[in-house]
């Protein structure tokens, strides 16, 4: 790798970033591509590049969070040499680098051999030297890891001849190997079983091939939320930590990287222990965590981190620019279209979390109940608490929990905040349980808090400790899937409020509340990130700003919705529901380009200001599948989705519709300008480390991934910034935002 100067030498960037610029590396943005952007980013005024994950990911990965090899820098991005060239270019311009790290999980790739650690476990089972890496319940699977990858039940797959014994070259192993092949899926064959009849051979492996729908009910390895293709890694084991972090730690200690962003710490068994290890091995490098805080929740004080990645800033800034006076008007539109009552978000969240614990996360809740039942069965004083009763109590406690998790470390007294969070959730859960379950609920609360309960001489301490940890891990998954990834896609009062970590039921934030938050931020986490857009936000900051304008003239918005509904009535299919409609119209408004050609300017009545039809259709399909009302990822309703897509495409081609939105944009341009520039300047002058997401230094009304990962035209940004720096006037809102961003970053 090209040698670079370590942080702290003359001319090196500051150890703590002043500002960062997030780059989403991938096939369209390699290390060398990023290096070519360095002169522009230096002129923009940032101090550090903020890179998405760079370790070797699964074939075809577009984001890097599906790591398969912790010992290699991604070949597709340019390998170690490419990263060295980028680091040298950055240092030459006085910029540092921050790296995104994914400790919680690895990919279950196709073919599986790309993840050599997992391949070894599939081949050798619990005897594999890598068995300790993964969070597998070997007893539940009768010594086999469940692999739910089949498109039909195993018997049907065997009968159809779709599962075959093959011989292939497996990278990293000598000579051809016998494998089981199911289309693109390839699995190792256990030694000594190669010559068995196929059906018997399948049964003798250290993995169990199964129909994909079995995964949500019987999966015996912990995964990232409900994503079966991402298997959890046990970094709480120091040997596993060392093996999976050696390369990252070397990049930090050698000065190639100055800081780290830790992905999904709430999935880890002991986040505090993990962060302390990082701090010890990196001499206290700057580390931020992707921690989603609920309300006034703070990062636990024993975490060795400067703070979060900034979701708490992003949603508050959005609400600061929302007019509380517009709520009743927007409520009326939502109710008219969807039937959802004003103030009904709480019930919607509860409903969604119940669906999650009974559906995609049933296997995790079942495993949690098995643990609790084993603890109780082993203790005569607890034995009469039944599996069913424990399951009911755990289910209701998970649904009632109002944050991602309580941080309880086995063997240590729980913190006051953790006790309060669990006990308040139990109080809410009690209302949904038979009174006869009260004692069982009390036992569950004591168990998940790690308190003494049952016999004085407890046995199977390991199970009790595991229960404490696993409850917290499941809590985070239930909250994420139930709230962010379900309820927030169903609630359409003002969709920009349904942001990661957000509180849509608050609707707006007063100036006094913002200043109180900023003062607390400056006092407690002055070096944490302040984000506007991220790769995980549901909408980009400018999309949210544009949608906030709806609250400033809710009456006019209501009339516009009536107008476009009347215009589209002749071709709006009967399958299209109010949820899809309200989402559609708000998305068109939020992504409208304020300075592009409108129907009034175009002779054919078309509009360059409207979102491209394919972008809109792709987004609506994803959002409606996430909502899981009329369609979903696991049970897609193609007729419904096509009806919504047809409405979206025809609406964008209808001059009556685009004309109405163009009029709205003209009449509310100053409100949009104030919101976009106001949010930008407020954030860039607030306490913390200012983060700019790629392309968001200019006006960029993006949507959820993959829309927000589209390539950025850096040549255009470079030319425009040079023109503005030369004294040319800003021609558009995009120019104004670029100018404000650059001036603020340079002042910092």
Region spans (language model):
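Acidic/aromatic-lined carbohydrate-recognition and catalytic surfaces
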Residues: 2-216, 222, 254, 264-331
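Short acidic/polar active-site loop segments enriched in Thr and Asp
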Residues: 47, 258, 690
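Extended, Lys/Arg-enriched charged tracts that mediate electrostatic binding to polyanionic substrates
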Residues: 124-185, 460-522, 657-658, 666-673, ...
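Active-site cores of enzymes that catalyze phosphoryl transfer or operate on phosphate-rich substrates
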Residues: 174-248, 330-364, 534
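Polyanionic (Asp/Glu-rich) segments that form extended negatively charged tracts
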Residues: 271, 276, 285, 313-380, ...
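Conserved phosphate/anionic-ligand binding catalytic regions in large, soluble enzymes, centered on
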Residues: 398-405, 483, 527-543, 584-593, ...
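Extended, charge-enriched "interface" segments that sit outside catalytic cores
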Residues: 426-431, 437-448, 452-465, 528-531, ...
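Catalytic cores of secreted or luminal carbohydrate-active enzymes
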Residues: 715-748
């Amino acid at each position: 790798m090209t040698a670079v100067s370590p942080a702290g030498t003359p001319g090196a960037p500051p150890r703590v970033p002043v500002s960062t610029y997030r780059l989403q590396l991938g096939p369209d943005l390699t290390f060398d591509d990023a290096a070519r952007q360095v002169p522009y980013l230096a002129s923009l005024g940032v101090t550090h590049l903020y890179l998405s994950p760079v370790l070797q990911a699964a074939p075809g990965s577009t984001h890097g969070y599906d790591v398969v090899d912790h010992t290699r820098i991604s070949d597709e991005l340019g390998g170690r040499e490419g990263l060295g060239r980028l680091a040298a270019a950055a240092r030459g311009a006085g910029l540092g680098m921050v790296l995104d790290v994914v400790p919680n999980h690895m990919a279950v790739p196709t073919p599986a051999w790309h993840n050599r650690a997992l391949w070894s476990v599939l081949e050798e089972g619990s005897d594999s030297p890598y068995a300790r890496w993964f969070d597998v319940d070997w007893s539940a699977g009768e010594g086999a890891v469940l692999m739910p990858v089949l498109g039909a039940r195993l018997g049907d797959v065997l009968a159809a001849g779709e599962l075959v014994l093959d011989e292939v070259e497996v990278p990293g192993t000598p000579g051809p190997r016998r494998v089981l092949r199911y289309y693109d899926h390839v699995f190792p064959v256990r030694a000594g079983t190669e010559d068995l009849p196929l059906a018997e051979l399948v049964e003798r492996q250290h993995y169990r091939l199964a129909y994909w729908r079995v995964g949500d009910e019987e999966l015996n390895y912990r995964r990232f939320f409900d994503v079966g293709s991402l298997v959890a890694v046990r970094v709480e084991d120091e040997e596993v930590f060392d093996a999976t972090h050696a390369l990252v730690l070397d990049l930090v200690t050698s000065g190639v990287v100055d800081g780290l962003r830790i992905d999904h710490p709430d999935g880890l068994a002991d986040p505090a222990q993990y962060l302390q290890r990082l701090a010890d091995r990196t001499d206290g490098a700057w580390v931020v965590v992707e921690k989603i805080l609920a309300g006034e929740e703070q990062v636990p004080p024993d975490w060795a981190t400067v703070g979060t990645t900034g979701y708490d800033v992003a949603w508050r800034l959005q609400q600061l620019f929302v007019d509380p006076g517009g709520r009743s008007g927007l409520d009326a539109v939502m109710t008219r279209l969807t039937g959802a009552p004003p103030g009904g978000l709480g019930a919607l969240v509860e409903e969604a979390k119940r669906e999650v614990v009974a559906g995609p996360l049933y296997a995790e809740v079942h495993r949690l109940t098995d643990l609790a039942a084993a603890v109780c069965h082993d203790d005569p004083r607890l034995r009469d608490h039944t599996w069913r009763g424990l399951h009911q109590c755990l289910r209701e406690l998970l649904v009632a929990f109002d944050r991602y998790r309580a941080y309880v470390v086995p063997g240590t007294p729980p913190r006051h905040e953790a006790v309060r969070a669990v006990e308040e959730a139990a109080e809410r859960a009690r209302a949904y349980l038979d009174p006869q379950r009260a004692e069982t609920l009390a036992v569950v609360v004591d168990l998940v808090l790690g308190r003494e309960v049952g016999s004085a001489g407890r046995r199977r301490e390991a199970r009790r400790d595991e229960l404490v940890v696993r409850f917290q891990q499941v809590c985070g998954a239930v909250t994420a899937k139930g709230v962010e990834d379900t309820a927030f896609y169903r609630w359409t009062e003002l969709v920009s409020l349904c942001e990661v970590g957000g509180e849509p039921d608050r609707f707006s934030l007063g100036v006094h509340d913002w200043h109180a938050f900023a003062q607390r931020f400056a006092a407690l986490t002055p070096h944490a990130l302040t984000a506007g857009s991220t790769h995980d936000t549901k909408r980009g900051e400018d999309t949210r700003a544009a949608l906030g304008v709806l609250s400033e003239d809710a009456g006019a918005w209501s009339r516009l919705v009536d107008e476009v509904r009347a215009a589209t009535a002749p071709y709006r299919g009967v399958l299209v529901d109010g949820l899809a409609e309200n989402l559609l119209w708000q998305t068109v408004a939020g992504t409208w380009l304020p300075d592009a050609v409108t129907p009034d300017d175009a002779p054919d009545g078309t509009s360059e200001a409207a979102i491209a039809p394919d972008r809109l259709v792709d987004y609506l399909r994803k959002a409606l599948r996430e909502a899981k009302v009329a369609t979903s990822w696991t049970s897609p309703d193609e007729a419904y989705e096509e009806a919504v897509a047809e409405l979206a495409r025809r609406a964008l081609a209808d001059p009556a519709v685009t004309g109405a939105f163009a009029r709205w944009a003209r009449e509310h341009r100053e409100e949009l300008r104030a919101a976009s520039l106001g949010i930008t300047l407020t954030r860039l002058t607030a306490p913390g480390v200012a983060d700019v997401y790629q392309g968001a230094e200019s006006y960029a009304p993006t949507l959820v991934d993959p829309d927000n990962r589209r390539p950025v035209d850096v040549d255009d940004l470079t030319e425009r910034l040079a023109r503005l720096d030369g004294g040319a006037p800003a021609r558009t809102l995009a120019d104004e935002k670029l100018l404000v961003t650059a001036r603020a970053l340079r002042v910092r």
